[in-house]
Amino acid sequence: MNSSLKTSILSPVRWVGVLVLFSLFGSVALAQKAPRVTQHKLRILHTTDVHGNIFPYDFLNDRPGTGSMSRLSTVLREIRRTDPETLLLDAGDLLQGEPPTYYYNYVDTLSTHIVSSAMNYLGYDAVAMGNHDIEPGHSVFDKWGRECKFPLIAANIISDKTGEPYFKPYHVFTRAGLRVAVLGFTTPAIPQWVPAHLWEGLHFDDILTSAAHWVPLIQEREKPDLLVVLMHSGLENDNPDYLENAGRALANKGMGIDLLLIGHDHRQELEWIRPEGSTTDSVLLINPANHLDRVADIQITVRKEGGRVVSKQLVPSFISLEGVEPDSVFLRHFAQEYAAVNDYLATEVGELASEVRGEDALFGTTPYMDVIHRMQLESVGAEISFAAPLKTSAVLPAGKVYVRDLFKFCPFSNFLYAMQLTGREIRGYLEHSYAGWAATSITEDGGLIRLRPGAQPTDKYKTFVPPYNYSAAQGIDYTVDLSKPEGERVTILRLTGHSEPFDLDRTYRVAVN
C-alpha cells in the first residue's frame, strides 16, 4: 500500500455521532429560516372638540350636563384595567367653549390651567392643536404647552423665525411591542378667523403639502409599525380658497397612513376610504364629534413575522358617555377649581325687564341682538354694527343677569373691531349674509330660512349656512325683499335717526366681531 495514501474508516458509533450533528445543524438552519411570528394588540381612544367640557355640569343653565372629562375618567379606569397600554389622543379645540376655559384663560392666569391639569390627570398621550387652542393667544397656549405632560403636535404650524414646526410635528410611542408614529396637523384656515397678533410669528402650511413632506420622512426615519394622523380638520372641504377640512383629501392620498383621527367639523364620522390607485388597502377615518358625548375606540391587531408587519386589523367603534356616572375621584380632585369657576359665574352684572330668546334673531330684530349691537356701537364709536346670533338656543329669563348668562350671548371669546367700509361694501356684505340665511323664495310651508338641499327634520345641521353666520346690521334702516334675485334684495335707506339717504360711495365706521 502506498504510504502516502491514507484512508479512514469510521466505526458505526462515530457514524451515528456525525448524523446527529448534521441533524442538529439542519434543525438550527430550519429554525433560522422560519421567521418568528408575533401578534400585537393595541387600543387607541380618540376625543376631539371637547371645548372645555370638563365637569358634568351645564354652567350656563345651572343644571347637570352631558359628556365631560369626568365621565371619560370613569371609562378610562375600566379600560386601563384590561388594556393598560391604551393610547389616549385628542384632535384639538380644548381651550375655548365653556366657562372653565374662559376663567383660566383670562381671569385666573397664574394657576395651572384647568385643561392641562385635567388632561394630565387623565393621562392623555398627545394632542393636535385646534383653531380654538390658538385663538386665546400666545400667552395662553404657550403656558398650556409648558404645563402639559404630553406633546402638543402640529407639523403645519410653522415658526417664521426658524422655518420649522413651532410645536412638535409628531411623536413615536412604543406600546404593546409596536412603534406607533402619531403625526399632527391643524386646519390652515386659522388666519381667516383669528387676529394675527394672537399667532404672531407663525404661519400655517397646507395639510396635504405638509403631509407629503412628513409622512415619507417618518417612514424612513422612524420605521413605524403604525402611522396615525391626528388632525384638527374635518372630512369634506367646501371652501375653494383653502383646504380647511382635509380628511377625505388626505385619505385619498394614502401615503401609507393607517388611521386618520379627525375633528373640527363637530360631525360623527366613521368611514373606510380607499386611496386613489389602491386596490386593496383602505384608510380608516373616524371622528367622535364634539362635547365628549362619545369617544372613538379603535382596537388594532398587528401580526409580525420576523419583526416585519404582515397584517393589520383595525376594528373601530364609539363609546357613548350617555348614562356613564362621573368619576367621583376626579370630581373631588378638581373640587377647588369647580368652586372657583362657579363663584365667578354667580357674579351679578345687571337685570332684564323681559325674557330674551336667541331663536328670535333668526326672523327679525330682537332684544338678544339689540344688546350685542348696542355694546359694539358704543365700545368703538361706530355708526353701524354687524353681528350674528352666536347661540340661537339661548334663553334669558326676566330678572337678574349673572356672568354665566353672558356666555349665552357669546360662548366664544370673539374680538371686536372697527372697520372703515364704503356703503357699497356694507350692502354687499348684507347681500352675502342673506344669500345664505334667507330662502330663495317663500317655500310652500312658509319657511323663511334657507335649508340644505335634502335636509331632514332630524338632521343636526339643517340650514344652508350655520346661524352664527347670519349677520344683520344695526345703525341703518334697511329692507330685505325675498321676491328679488340674490344680490338685489337689500335696500339701505338711511342711517338710523338721520334723514339723509344712505350713500353707497361714502365710508362708514362699522363694528364687527
Model regions: which residues?
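Acidic, Ser/Thr/Pro-rich beta/coil linker or hinge segments at domain junctions
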Residues: 320-352
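Glycine-rich phosphate/diphosphate-binding loops and the adjacent beta-loop-alpha structural elements
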Residues: 345-365
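Bacterial N-terminal signal peptides
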Residues: 16-26
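N-terminal accessory/precursor segments of enzymes
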Residues: 184-195, 314-318, 328, 343, ...
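Feature captures C-terminal
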Residues: 35, 40-43, 53, 63, ...
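Acidic, metal/ion-coordinating pockets
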Residues: 31-323, 363-375, 385
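Flexible, glycine/charged-enriched surface loops at secondary-structure junctions
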Residues: 221-224, 230, 345-349, 383-389, ...
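Bacterial N-terminal signal peptides that target proteins for export
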Residues: 2-17
